[in-house]
UniProtKB/Swiss-Prot annotation:
Residues 88-131 are annotated as: Disordered. The modification Phosphoserine is found at S85. The keyword Phosphoprotein applies. Keywords: Apoptosis, Hydrolase, Phosphoprotein, Protease, Thiol protease, Zymogen. One of its GO terms (biological process) is regulation of inflammatory response. Residues 1-92 form the CARD domain. It comes from Macaca mulatta (Rhesus macaque). It holds the Pfam family Peptidase_C14. Involved in the activation cascade of caspases responsible for apoptosis execution. GO terms for molecular function: cysteine-type endopeptidase activity. This is Caspase-12.
Length: 421
């Protein structure tokens, strides 16, 4: 090998010469120890010579393209700073209307709103670092950790027999036609788009399918379109040979309803909770009579933070305003009495009047927790216990906080999912 010193002005040539010196020494050792014969060494040398000789062309090519890459990255970062933020957004229907009001306000009001916006950003950023380690919030949206734990058939048979009077009947897998409906709205005419909600959709679809449900998906609907979709779903004949159903709603929201895609303050577009319950009650959906009807809602219910500060250790618990007794009525056949609203459970992402948080990059915290706890415990725990575990994961308030609530619970038995059976 030539002993020529590499030029300091040509780093590529320097690397070439150093590489040749090192390889020559290695090849000599391989020949001396009979690891390679002359022909093998010649073929290997041809390939290495090609790589070394073309290294200069590669560096020139990279150098030329690096300038273009740098310009693209610079433009992207400066024109789309929001894509790099790791902020949580709440699902309140007030967001966009507040922005439209700001455009017509005085400069002083605009400055105040800017300060409030910065405070929210700081709080959201702090929340991402304030999540307690016991809450598995890294398990987000469509990428939950682990698989659904299946219930051993022997355990399923034993519990089904021993607690037959306490649990809802579970149909055999063969011939069973479970259905679930997911309504997810991401794009809105006047409200902010719900970026990250597609991960919630994929995660819930995967969970429900693994639990044995055929999932019907509806996206970006107005309130009227949502009502139509619900009535069509309630009329599906598959419910007759099913033992339960899930209804999942993901959108912006108000206190007692889900916002449609055309909602704004001047012209509300809201599907009210009462409408959902009315469509699936025993009067209007007899195919699901005496069968669990699980409603899950990811949406804000106001703009409150949902926290209170105490100066002492004492404090009064707030009253639950949704635990009202439901009246019973006579069904149309006038032969057998049945409660109009029965076998429902609604699990909402926040308490009344308060916000619910969603991460643009990983979806909503509420949905991710549901997915995690269902996968971990649905093989052995009934539904209310699983929901309670989700609630406990939110028990300690963080910088931004929410507390899921169980409402309009009219189940008279325990609902076990027995995944795998």
């Amino acid at each position: 090998m030539a002993d020529k010193k590499p030029s300091k002005e040509d780093p590529v040539n320097m690397v070439k010469l150093l590489t040749r010196n090192v390889l020559d020494g290695i090849f000599d050792d391989l020949m001396e120890n009979n690891v390679l014969n002359t022909e093998e060494l010649r073929n290997l040398g041809k390939g290495l010579n090609f790589m070394v000789n073309n290294a200069g062309n590669l560096v020139d090519n990279i150098t030329e393209k690096a300038q273009m890459v740098g310009k693209i990255l610079k433009d992207r970062l400066l024109s789309h700073p929001k894509q790099l933020s790791l902020e949580y957004q709440h699902e309140s229907e007030d967001q966009e209307s507040e922005e439209s009001s700001a455009s017509s306000s005085s400069s002083t009001e605009s400055e105040e709103e800017n300060e409030e916006s910065k405070d929210e950003e700081r709080a959201a950023s702090a929340h991402s670092m304030a999540v307690p380690p016991t809450a598995p919030l890294e398990i987000q949206g469509a990428q939950p950790s682990g698989r659904l734990k299946l219930c051993p058939h022997a355990h399923f048979r034993e519990l089904k027999t021993k607690r037959a009077d306490e649990i809802y009947p579970v149909m055999e897998k063969e011939g069973r036609t479970r259905l679930a409906l997911i309504i997810c709205s991401k794009e809105f005419h006047y409200l902010l788009n719900r970026n990250g909600s597609e991960l919630d959709l994929l995660g819930m679809q995967d969970l429900l399918e693994n639990l044995g449900y055929s999932v019907v998906i509806e996206e970006n609907l107005t309130a009227q379109e949502m009502e139509t979709a619900l009535r069509q779903f309630a009329a599906r004949p598959e419910h007759q040979s099913s033992d339960s159903t899930f209804l999942v709603f993901m959108s912006h929201g108000i206190l007692n309803g889900i916002c449609g895609t055309k909602h704004w303050d001047q012209e509300p577009d809201v599907l009210h909770d009462d409408t959902i319950f009315e469509i699936f009650n025993n009067r209007n959906c007899r195919s699901l009579r005496d069968k669990p009807k699980v409603i899950i809602m990811q949406a804000c219910r106001g703009s409150g933070a949902g926290i209170v500060w105490f100066t002492t250790d004492s404090g009064k618990a707030s009253a639950d305003t949704h635990g009202q007794l439901l009246q019973s009525s006579i069904c149309n056949d006038a032969v057998t009495k049945a409660h109009v609203e029965k076998d429902f459970i609604a699990f909402k992402s926040s308490t009344p009047h308060n916000v619910s948080w969603r991460h643009e990059m990983s979806g909503s915290v509420f949905i991710s927790q549901i997915i995690y706890y269902f996968k971990e415990y649905s093989w052995s725990h009934h539904l209310e216990e699983i929901f309670r575990k989700v609630q406990r994961s939110f028990e300690t308030p963080n910088v931004v906080t929410q507390l899921p609530t169980i409402e309009r619970l009219s189940m008279t038995r325990y609902f076990y999912l027995f995944p795998g059976n």
